Design a protein with these regions (language model features):
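Residue-level signal for secondary-structure boundary sites
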Residues: 26-28, 75, 128-130
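Internal, well-folded beta-alpha domain core
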Residues: 82-84, 91-221
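Glycine/small-residue-rich interface belts in oligomeric ring/scaffold proteins
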Residues: 9, 32, 37-81
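A short, structural micro-pattern
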Residues: 12, 61, 112-116
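N-terminal, Lys/Arg- and Ser/Thr-rich interaction peptides
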Residues: 5-34, 208
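Residue-level detector of short, conserved catalytic/binding motifs and their immediate flanks
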Residues: 16, 65, 118
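Beta-strand elements of well-folded, non-transmembrane domains
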Residues: 20-24, 71, 120-128
Length: 221
């Protein structure tokens, strides 16, 4: 792999790397309400979802550093069934309300991505209560990637678009440079309601670099 000069962890370590791919993906832009339109690249929040599907412990969090685009960006349109009846987080946890998906089903157009492939670079950041060093989480993650082990099936933005994963290869990133606009950086679920941070995203020679800190703002994820 090409040395991208990515930021190192607090201990001075390079990021772990995993390669992911799939037949389709949908990384929804939050500013478009009527139709779902995908960003042309995987978002950091979607990358965290993939990483946590492979390996997660409450003693650490994933910090995505960069995402490389390895396949040509191709779009297609799909009509998807969705529901307008959504339970709150408290209702979902308690199970006290049944969501009526049949009575509240709507069809929405979605502009999705076809035949995608990415390399995710990320740090495992231990919290203050962790009894293990950062290296222990990195090594366990790498072993799970090599074995193909995961806690749940990773997906690419939406659950119907499954992701495959494996050790990274030497495939070069696509020579694509494009300003992507505002993109979700992270979600803090410790606040009520959850708070979001954002960043001004740009793809440069096929690489999306993610800043260590996002910009606080209000809005939909």
């Amino acid at each position: 792999m090409v040395n991208l000069g990515l930021r190192r962890s607090a201990s001075g370590a390079s990021p772990v790397v995993v390669q992911v791919w799939g037949e389709a993906a949908l990384f929804t832009r939050p500013e478009l309400k009527v139709e779902r339109v995908s960003y042309p690249v995987m978002t950091p929040s979607a990358a965290v979802g993939v990483l946590e599907s492979i390996y997660w412990k409450p003693q650490f969090r994933w910090d995505v550093v960069a995402i490389e685009v390895l396949a040509e960006i191709k779009q297609f349109t799909q009509r998807r069934n969705e529901t307008t009846d959504l339970a709150s987080l408290a209702e979902a946890v308690s199970g006290r309300r049944r969501v009526d998906t049949v009575a509240n089903r709507v069809q929405r157009n979605a502009v999705c991505l076809r035949d995608v492939a990415y390399r995710i670079h990320a740090h495992a950041v231990p919290d203050k209560n962790s009894d293990k060093p950062e290296a222990a989480y990195r090594d366990q993650f790498r072993r799970r990637v090599t074995r193909g082990s995961c806690f749940s099936q990773p997906y690419l933005g939406v659950r119907e678009f499954s992701a495959f994963f494996g050790d990274p290869d030497d495939r070069p990133a696509q020579p694509i440079t494009e300003k992507l606009g505002l993109m979700l950086h992270s979600v803090d679920h410790s606040t009520t309601p959850p708070s979001f941070t954002w960043f001004d995203a740009e793809l440069v020679n096929g690489v999306l670099r993610v800043p260590e800190q996002g910009i606080p703002a209000t809005g939909a994820a």
